[in-house]
A protein has these predicted regions:
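Short functional micro-motifs and their immediate structural scaffolds
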Residues: 258-262, 289
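Short metal-binding segments enriched for Cys and/or His
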Residues: 280-301
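Conserved beta-sheet core of the metallophosphoesterase superfamily
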Residues: 55-59, 77-78, 163-232
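Residues immediately within or flanking Cys/His clusters that coordinate Zn2+
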Residues: 250, 278
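Active-site environment of divalent metal-dependent phosphoester hydrolases
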Residues: 9-15, 33-38, 62-69, 101, ...
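Active-site-proximal loop/helix segment associated with metal-binding centers of metalloenzymes
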Residues: 90, 104-181
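Active-site neighborhood of phospho(di)ester-bond hydrolases with catalytic His/Asp-centered motifs
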Residues: 4-6, 26-31, 56-63, 95-96, ...
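Core catalytic region of metal-dependent phosphoesterases/phosphodiesterases
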Residues: 5, 10-103, 176
Length: 303
């Protein structure tokens, strides 16, 4: 079966309880986190993922090196198209941008890449930034030439068409005029020229549906059934919903809107100046938080 989830950024806790087999495929919609440091840290993560029985089918995000730029990867034929793999980690598959695959009986077009809004900050601090994080002009033209007027079942991308941008996720401190939206404009063209049934993307760290496009983040969905796979904390059976919750005056559960909640700070976890928290709802049995690893130890004992 085919499953799909959003950005992982090196956090793979969500896959631990699934019990999938060698015939199952897990799509990660970019920013996977295994080609980020380009050193032993990446290798340790890959060694962990190597133990899973199922295959990971990864899309290129903006916070990772392209596999074609890493010497250990080589190009092979798989699922009716070209992919990148490493001999040591055959279940960790990276899609090639612009390729059309046949997976689980579905035709799937892959378009990775996006702009990093924190590019200048990363460069100034000496953090990783990847200069070819976005598709080149030639890559974009090739995709339009190849697929205009054609039908595909599914489009997988990291970012989204411009018209679908989730403005509620924009940073108020960052003027949008400073953001390179060339990929989003390009994906607008793709949407206009390519006939498709469903589109999945990541990048924005939220879950939302806009027409036939679905933003994915922390949850896992079965593409075959359209149902989300519950993501459980083994200690208490509460479903984990990986949404970003910033420190503010929460009075109600983000999901069921009930007031039977407990708020836990994530061990001082701080991102872009915001303290992130976990909201634990005793009514709908869900935990809302930014990062499983940070808040899982903080779940109250009474749960």
């Amino acid at each position: 079966m085919l499953y799909i989830t959003g950005d992982t950024h090196g956090d793979f806790y969500r896959f631990g309880h699934l019990g999938l087999n060698k015939d199952d495929i897990m799509v990660i919609l970019g920013d996977v986190g295994i080609n980020y440091y380009l050193d032993e840290c990446d290798k340790k993560l890959k060694e962990r993922l190597k133990r899973y029985n199922f295959k990971f089918f990864c899309i290129q995000g903006n916070h990772e090196e392209r596999p074609e730029n890493i010497s250990s990867y080589h190009e092979v034929e798989m699922f009716g198209g070209k992919v990148f793999v490493e001999d040591e980690y055959p279940n960790l598959i990276f899609a090639k941008n612009g390729e059309l695959y046949n997976i689980d009986g579905k035709s799937i077009l892959v378009i990775g890449g996006a702009y990093s809004i924190d590019k200048d900050y990363r460069i100034s601090k000496g953090y990783q930034w990847f200069k070819d994080e976005q598709l080149t002009e030639q890559e974009r033209l090739d995709i339009l030439d190849k697929y205009s007027g054609k039908h595909v079942d599914i489009i997988l991308s990291h970012t989204c068409p411009l018209r679908c941008e989730p403005k509620e996720s924009f940073k108020l401190s960052l003027p949008q005029i400073a953001v390179d939206k060339s990929m989003e404009y390009f994906l607008n063209e793709v949407e206009q020229r390519v006939d498709y049934d469903k589109w999945y993307c990541g990048h924005y760290h939220l879950e939302k549906i806009v027409d036939k496009l679905e933003f994915m983040f922390g949850r896992i969905k079965s593409v075959d059934t359209g149902e989300f796979i519950p993501k459980y904390d083994f200690h208490n059976g509460y479903e984990i919903v990986r949404d970003a919750c910033s420190q503010k005056d929460y009075k109600y559960c983000p999901g069921c809107k009930g007031d039977n909640i407990i708020i836990e700070k994530c061990e001082g976890h701080n991102i872009n100046g915001l303290d992130f928290i976990a909201i634990i709802c005793n009514d709908c049995k869900k935990v809302y938080g930014f990062n499983d690893v940070n808040y899982k130890p903080n779940c109250p004992k009474e749960l």
